[in-house]
UniProtKB/Swiss-Prot annotation:
This is Peptidoglycan-binding protein ArfA. SUPFAM superfamilies: OmpA-like. Controversial; may form oligomers, or not. It is found in: Secreted, Cell wall; Cell outer membrane. Changing R277E: Loss of peptidoglycan-binding; in association with A236. Its main location: secreted. Residues 1-21 are annotated as: Disordered. It comes from Mycobacterium tuberculosis (strain ATCC 25618 / H37Rv). Its cofactor is Zn(2+). GO terms for biological process: ammonium transmembrane transport; monoatomic ion transport; response to acidic pH; response to host pH environment. May bind Zn(2+) via residues in the BON domain. Keywords: Cell outer membrane, Cell wall, Disulfide bond, Ion transport, Membrane, Metal-binding, Secreted, Transmembrane, Transmembrane helix, Transport, Zinc.
């Protein structure tokens, strides 16, 4: 019986051990509280370590920022140096251009100065890193400067400086107006001087005693031009034939032919047009035998109107050429 009893107790012990190995009771309340609180404490510690208050360690005030420099503003203050100077029949060019096209624009604008027989000293260099003044519309400036034998133009940063000796304040102002119209964003400094009145020479005699009055009597006043035109009419040729005769009779006489326009359009258009009108009259006089080196021409644009530009009749009178004995 004892043997049976021992055998009967063994399975009970085995079942008990199996029950202890695979069966777990519910976790207690303290364990659950710890499982919730401990992660919260860790998160709070991490926040305190990595999230610094701005009031303690952050910068105060407005933070400086880096902004790109405006290319337009920078170019206005960093134009390359350029010098254009005229001495009689010699024009000297010194400076830098970024490419051949920019240099070609200057040479085209200089057409009014580069007459046959003019010597050009070209010391222009091409440097791709520089910024230069735009001369693509600058021809009126040099056309207006033709009567100034020592004309100079200098470009430095954002300033254009004009120099030379003009025969009159009209010529001085014409160059300034042309430069201002061509480069409205530049500072234009007009240092052109006006020559003083030359001491009177011995009085002329005969038909040359009062040549200006004689020419005025022949022309009957200024020679007029049609709207936007630079062409002479048959009546003008008859008048200029008689003017040429007067000038040839006074071989020492010198004249300036001033061209004008009405106030229609900008001076960038008016000055070249007025210069063209003066030149066509001068060319005809030369063709009739007047010495070319005794004639100077200048385009003055719309300045010095002789009639009101408010009416078509007044504008027609202002489109004119005047022959002035020097």
């Amino acid at each position: 019986m004892a043997s049976k009893a021992g055998l009967g107790q063994t399975p009970a012990t085995t079942d008990a051990r199996r029950t202890q190995k695979f069966y777990r009771g519910s976790p207690g309340r303290p364990w659950l509280i710890g499982a919730v609180v401990i992660p919260l404490l860790i998160a709070a510690i991490g926040y305190g370590a990595f999230e610094r208050p701005q009031s303690v360690t952050g910068p105060t005030g407005v933070l400086p920022t880096l902004t790109p420099t405006s290319t337009r503003g920078a170019s206005a203050l960093s134009l390359s140096l350029l010098s254009i100077s005229r001495s009689g029949n010699t024009v000297t060019l010194i400076g830098d251009f970024p490419d051949e096209a920019a240099k070609a624009a200057l040479m085209t604008a200089l057409n009014g100065l580069l007459a046959p027989g003019v010597n050009v000293i070209d010391q222009i260099h091409v440097d791709p890193v520089v910024r230069s003044l735009d001369f693509s519309s600058a021809e009126p400036v040099f056309t207006a400067s033709v009567p100034i034998p020592d004309f100079g133009l200098k470009v430095e940063r954002d300033t254009v400086t004009l120099t030379g000796t003009a025969p009159s304040s009209e010529h001085k102002d014409a160059v300034k107006r042309a430069a201002t119209s061509t480069w409205p964003d530049m500072k234009i400094v007009n240092n052109i001087e006006v020559t003083g009145q030359a001491p009177p020479g011995p009085p002329a005699s005969g038909p040359c005693a009062d040549l200006q009055s004689a020419i005025n009597a022949v022309t009957g006043g200024p020679i007029a031009f049609g709207n936007d035109g630079a062409s002479l009419i048959p009546a003008d040729y008859e008048i200029l034939n008689r003017v040429a005769d007067k000038l040839k009779a006074c071989p020492d006489a010198r004249v300036t032919i001033n061209g004008y326009t009405d106030n229609t359009g900008s001076e960038g258009i008016n000055i070249p047009l007025s210069a063209q009108r003066a030149k066509i009259v001068a060319d005809y006089l030369v063709a009739r035998g007047v010495a070319g080196d005794h004639i100077a021409t200048v385009g003055l644009g719309s300045v010095n109107p002789i009639a009101s530009n408010a009416t078509p009749e007044g504008r027609a009178k202002n489109r004119r050429v005047e022959i002035v004995v020097n």
